[in-house]
Amino acid sequence: MTTLTLNTSLLSSRRILAAFSGGLDSTVLLHQLVLWRERHPDVTLRAIHIHHGLSPHAESWVRHCETVCARWQVPLVVERVTLADNGLGIEAHAREARYRAFAQTLLPGEVLATAQHLDDQCETFLLALKRGSGPAGLSAMGERSPFAGTLLLRPLLRETRKTLEQWAVRHGLCWIEDESNQDDAYDRNFLRLRALPLLQQRWPHFPAAVARSATLCAEQERLLDELLASDLTDCITTEGTLRLSPLMSMSDVRRAAILRRWLAMRNAPMPSRDALERIWQEVALARDDASPCLRFGDHEIRRYQSQLWWIKSVAGQHETTVAWPVWQTPLALPAGLGTVQLVPGGELRRPREEESVSIRFKAPGLLHIVGRHGGRKLKKIWQEQGIPPWRRDTTPLLFYGETLIAAAGVFVTREGAAEDKEGVSLVWHA
């Protein structure tokens, strides 16, 4: 193995963030990137280590990564993530948390490099095959993928695990061994420890053949993307929702392809065939007066105004009141709803000295809003403003004392309207 085995054609960016677990694969990747940096002094290289908290050795792994990065003069970011049960299983949840941390750490103009190799590609293909995936799932991993507004690069994807190990031994590299990698209760470990050695004993080039099949599946998906581009344009709204009316006249196969691509655009997990059928039958075709909802992990698919919505699940806050004693500073909202702040300049009056300020999520009685005659109940206002049902008890309502002043981004009440130029605006950062 030589330095040329790193697919440097991918490294057009000169700012690289390398995912570094401290294991064999990521150690070889980081070593090769360090050598690449030596030949290209304009390259800026950082590493990121994710502390999942799953192993009793996690702290020693952090120290190992710090030592390696210090020796190679690579700035290291250590991110500690908290894993909670979200119904996806520990492997999937750890991966989700890991990539969320990657996305949050990337700097402008920086690309992410990860250490997946040919054997990983084979495992990913077989896991997709086990799930009954179609060409999209069987495409496995690409060497270059869009990620968090930049790129995710896999410059070792053409190399085998054996080749990486030979490189590491030849160059005297040290790496950690995660004890969980020997637990064949995990599907990927079962393939790596039991199934693939047997297959390679019979067919030594099995991983390379699988990689070729994955490439062919990816090419078919790209062709379908081109052919369905105009359909997607017709179906997807500026808000990212999916119009149902164009789908009604499509064949089952074409409609399923559109649904899959829409979900991919929303960064949703690849749905199974059964899941697509449930989306169509239970959500899209639910009766007109229903508010159908189908859960997928910590997200939901809902229907509103003849459109499908992919949204994050948030518990209703109907009974919640959040005091805002220092209204001049931003206020954190519960349930991950973000923050609100009152900024100078706007159509809301400032609170009077004797008025307490709070955020609530319900308002009783008849409300009089700016631009409308007569009083209306809040439910009627939500309907008139086209606010989906699931946003109605999660949209912040600003109160001064017991007086409703405004709904963030939706309306201002007459009692809350500014009478002079010294008004404020309610800004919601969801």
From Swiss-Prot:
Cytoplasm among keywords: yes
The protein's Enzyme Commission number: 6.3.4.19
SUPFAM superfamilies per UniProt: Adenine nucleotide alpha hydrolases-like, MesJ substrate recognition domain-like, PheT/TilS domain
Location(s) in or outside the cell: Cytoplasm
InterPro entries: Lysidine-tRNA-synth_C, Rossmann-like_a/b/a_fold, TilS/TtcA_N, tRNA_Ile_lys_synt, tRNA_Ile_lys_synt_N, tRNA_Ile_lys_synt_subst-bd
Catalytic activity: cytidine(34) in tRNA(Ile2) + L-lysine + ATP = lysidine(34) in tRNA(Ile2) + AMP + diphosphate + H(+)
Gene3D superfamilies, sorted: 1.20.59.20, HUPs (3.40.50.620)
Amino-acid positions noted as binding ATP in the UniProt annotation, renumbered to this chain: 21-26
Keywords: ATP-binding, Cytoplasm, Ligase, Nucleotide-binding, tRNA processing
Main EC class the enzyme belongs to: ligase
Pfam families, per database record: ATP_bind_3, TilS, TilS_C
CDD domains: TilS_N (cd01992)
Molecular-function GO term, any one: ATP binding
GO CC annotation terms, alphabetical: cytoplasm
Assigned protein family: Belongs to the tRNA(Ile)-lysidine synthase family.
Name recorded for this polypeptide: tRNA(Ile)-lysidine synthase
Organism: Salmonella dublin (strain CT_02021853)
High-level lineage: Bacteria, Pseudomonadati, Pseudomonadota, Gammaproteobacteria, Enterobacterales
Gene behind the chain: tilS
